[in-house]
Amino acid sequence: MLSPTQKRASLLASGAAVAGLLISSLAAGGVSYAADNESCRPDGLYKTPGVDVPYCSVYDTEGREKMGADHQRRVIGYFTSWRTGKNGQPAYLAKDIPWDKITHVNYAFGHVGGDNKLSVGADGPDNASTGMTWPGVAGAEMDPEFPYKGHFNQLNKFKKQHPNVRTLISVGGWAETGGYFDDNGDRVNSGGFYSMATNADGSVNQAGIDTFANSAVDFIRKYGFNGVDIDYEYPTTMKDAGNPLDWQVANARRAGLVKGYAALMKSLREKLDRAGAADGRHYLLTVAAPSSGYLLRGMETFQVQKYLDYVNIMSYDLHGAWNEYVGPNASLFDDGKDGELAAANVYGSAQYGNIGYLNTDWAYHYFRGSMPSGRINIGLPYYTRGHKNVQGGTDGLWGKAAATSCPAGAGLTKCGDGAVGIDNLWHDKDTNGQESPAGSNPMWHAKNLEKGIVGDYVTQYGFPANTTLTGTYARKYDSTLVAPWLWNAQKKVFLSTEDEQSVAAKADYVVDRGIGGTMIWELAGDYGWNAAKGQYEMGDTLTSLMYDKFKAATPYGAKKSNKALPTQAVNVGVEFTEFKLGDSNYPITPKIKITNNTATALPGGTEFQFDYGTSAPSNASDQSGFGTKVISSDHTGSNVGGLKGDFHRVSLKLPAWQSLAPGASVDLAFNYYLPVSTPSNWTVNINGTTYALAGDLARGTTTVEPGTTTPPTTPPTTEPTTPPTTPPTTPPTTPPTTPPTGCTAPAYVAGQVYNGGSLVSHKGHTWKAQWWTQNEEPGTTGEWGVWKDQGAC
């Protein structure tokens, strides 16, 4: 049985398959309206139509998250449910979290139940989340204010002491994406995310999604969470991706997984927004996203990013014992020597631009193409991965270690030779109940190995008290990769690690590039020195280091574009469609569908421009006569030591003979070679005037009809940000010539249209419209309605 601890485990099928470009939809957005909460909305974040989302409860007026004066960047820690200490192994409880050093806690994990509802299992004294207690453990006393016990009681107890820290319920993970563990610890292969979001025929299971999303709202309200983190591993079209136990249900649905994922995230965003408006607090929606170019190749352009407050990149598990290629678990940069990529001739194939895609920097730039840097967090592993019997390489790095067989249930016919025994303390078990070779250890154990120390905890993991170490675990470090490792030359064991040097470099990288922060899997892996015992144990050394790096940092980047864009936008929709599936998705020529949702014809020769991320080389082209070309690039050449900039700027034009009438669409075929997320920062030049596109959801833009400065006379056809309402066919009542005595704003007139930001006087008060409105009397719409009371006048 695969245990719950096999969370973000091997990518298994990540292999050396070369990724192809995947680009997805940029649907036309709606009119932007001036409103107090709108001033706090993060750039590019989708807003639920008709809802005054209380963004200002979480974000400042620049759209940056408010986390406390000494937290300029995020430090997000995953806190796992299973390290309770009840099995005799070291416990990691809520009291052990360095609450003053972090900004968010993601609780791992909730799951999708057989009824499609969010669950952590049945209540009871053995339920770690809601029922367990720790009598006699100092700091783990239950808070009687809460009607539940367990970790949830403890998390809320400490949140009262640290009100700036936000908690999210993380749902899924490696072991519970396609099923869940019942109260007996047996896995139920229910289908999980796969069947909840996608029907067997590949269509969207909206009923299942609605059930889950409604239950998620109920769950966070009941247990005091600040949001939901979706850890769906993985909604990709790549065959045999994810947990082998899920392949039967997942593979049958591959063609519809991306669409189901998008529907799930949109529904969650909208239901959380409505709940937040009712509760007066903005609820966060985040995901744990893959970093592998192989997996992302099957996820189109990760078009769900617009629904997310931020994305946490799982920028680890980039190398491990699922194959023979020995390399870092989570290198920051490429060095041009990655054994897995070299075997696939990635470096030798011109179309890939000499770009290596198994590193944190590549993954960051993939998401940077569609999101502000501040809505991205890079992942750091507080655990090791490694091989034994390594042949070749430099101190094991870029060597090979092939196994003669694979663990039961791995679903593979060829595997790497993973480290075992004392080099695999945090191992999972295969489906036969045997140790799964992986070289998986908490960093506190790896530090003891490095120092030649056998910690007294080894007996709690089944080792005898007189255990001795064989050979020396020499620390090695590659400054180009920003990657440390331990090399035992006698045992030929390679263990990829993290320590102060690598974490400091990654923290500097975050600060220098305006990135939102870091995400940690998992908090219990951090280390501290116990001088009394002469050994490393669970601690907060690395987390404290990041806190110190971030506390005085400059504010993170809050804008998608690095250049000024037009403040007027038009409703021209751009959608990316017709992706091939799985391994057929390379090379890729998706169709780009441009739809004119304005009332003005777009003449032949109309130019569109957009940015795509430097995760792909600057060789974009089209096959439809639109003259697509890259007109500027922030990066060229290899990415050894990191990509040097964020975007490639692309130009394409309607053919001179082809105009685009109102309501009409045109398709063109694109060609790319490495994955990018949804292209952004679109502009269109119509009759000499350059506009933004409403679908980019940029802050500070107003949607207008081309050639005017006024909003369209009819609502947009896709994703309006306000309720669609047709203006009256008869003139409104003529307003009074003077407002009521003492009031300076015009008097409210029933039937008149008011745009967001409009001020009126009514019944002795001044009122401000939060969005477009008509026939809604001030004072009757409630606290979260369209009219906000500005005080007596």
Regions found by a protein language model. Name each.
Residues 645-648, 653-707:
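Terminal connector regions
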Residues 117-142, 235-435:
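Substrate-binding surface in catalytic domains of secreted glycosidases
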Residues 83-84, 439-440, 444-555, 576-577, ...:
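Extracellular low-complexity, Gly/Ser/Thr-rich intrinsically disordered linkers
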Residues 593-601, 612-614:
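Asparagine-centered strand-capping/turn motif at beta-strand->loop junctions
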Residues 35-220, 410, 414-448, 456, ...:
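Glycan-recognition patch characteristic of GH18 chitinases/ENGases
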Residues 1-34, 713, 717-721, 725-729, ...:
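Secretory targeting and sorting signals
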Residues 584-592, 604, 666, 752:
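Short, solvent-exposed loop/turn segments enriched in Ser/Thr/Gly
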Residues 705-715, 719-793:
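Tryptophan-rich substrate-binding surfaces of secreted polymer-degrading and adhesive proteins
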